[in-house]
């Protein structure tokens, strides 16, 4: 219908936006936000840590249990049920129970179904509501904000410039054929050209399947590790297209007072039902009729 709905970072502006599009859901929205922040506090420390080792033995097992107990010692029964609901429930059912406004549901959907090759009514998708609350930021409960001017390649160039200032040698057009292993330790890599690079530490930014099953001799890995890596599901839920435009696109309904940063990121979002239908279409090998499109003007 041409309506542009904003998700503001400050409560007064967000409250005003909600009173415009979903007057009956305003109080429930902020109650839900506080609940999410409280639940995210239990999980946030695990973002930058290895998950608990469920197979640990002896003193190591005691240490794992102590660390987990310390994190959850203040948890209430309501919070336990809330965490279980978010870890196992569906985003669509959660939103349908909580809110009446379709526009509010679509606003939350646009920010909460990340990296999931599935529809919003599939089990586990409610976890997306906690995604932005697990990486610090506003009161250490808000994740990333903003995007890179010049596109994501600007990050690569900044890393390269900073590394070269520190004396790092960067080799391009040098595909790796194999990670060298000796006595159970990575000792470097061999390039497709046949050149070998020795190293005390080898870091791979390739996906786990290619790293462990493509670049490492599988005889060097435990059978359980090979099986676990092979079973990682990595179906991509999205495609990316870059356009070079002669001018900024005009969005129907975009208020004239929006600043450039506010106009630089917007989403063409389907309804919950259409988002579920999109996934079903992809499973049949079809392109959905109502695409979900994130638009970023990075320049």
Regions inferred by a protein language model and the residue ranges of each:
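Dinucleotide-binding Rossmann-like beta1-alpha1 core, especially the glycine-rich loop
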Residues: 1-48, 81
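Short intrinsically disordered, low-complexity coil segments enriched in acidic
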Residues: 1-7, 154-157, 165-166, 199, ...
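Short N-terminal secondary-structure initiator segments
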Residues: 2-16, 54-87, 239-274
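Catalytic cores of large soluble enzymes that bind and process phosphate-bearing ligands
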Residues: 6, 10, 24, 28-31, ...
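Secondary-structure boundary/capping signal
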Residues: 26, 103-104, 167, 220
């Amino acid at each position: 219908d041409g309506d542009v709905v904003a998700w503001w970072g400050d409560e007064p502006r967000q409250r005003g936006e909600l009173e415009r599009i979903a007057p009956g859901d305003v109080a429930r929205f902020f109650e839900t936000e506080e609940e999410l922040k409280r639940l995210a506090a239990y999980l946030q420390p695990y973002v930058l840590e290895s998950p608990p080792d469920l197979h640990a033995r002896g003193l190591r097992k005691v240490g794992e249990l102590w660390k987990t107990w310390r994190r959850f010692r203040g948890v209430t029964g309501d919070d336990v049920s809330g965490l279980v609901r978010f870890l196992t429930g569906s985003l669509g059912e959660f939103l349908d129970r909580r809110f009446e406004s379709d526009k509010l549901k679509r606003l939350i959907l646009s920010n909460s179904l990340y990296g999931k090759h599935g529809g919003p009514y599939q089990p586990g998708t409610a976890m997306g509501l906690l995604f932005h609350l697990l990486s610090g930021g506003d009161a250490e409960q808000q994740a990333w904000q903003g995007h890179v001017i010049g596109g994501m390649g600007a990050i690569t160039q900044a890393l390269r410039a900073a590394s070269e200032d520190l004396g790092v040698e960067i080799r391009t057009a040098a595909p790796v054929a194999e990670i060298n292993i000796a006595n159970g330790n990575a000792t470097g890599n061999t390039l497709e050209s046949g050149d070998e690079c020795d190293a005390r530490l080898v870091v791979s930014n390739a996906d786990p399947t290619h790293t462990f099953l493509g670049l490492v001799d599988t005889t060097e890995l435990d059978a359980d590790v090979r099986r676990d890596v092979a079973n990682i599901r990595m179906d991509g839920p999205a495609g990316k297209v870059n356009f070079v435009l002669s001018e900024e696109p005009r969005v129907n309904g975009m208020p004239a007072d929006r600043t450039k940063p506010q106009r630089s990121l917007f989403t063409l979002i389907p309804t919950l039902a259409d988002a579920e239908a999109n996934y079903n279409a992809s499973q049949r090998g079809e392109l959905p009729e109502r695409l979900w499109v994130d638009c970023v003007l990075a320049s």
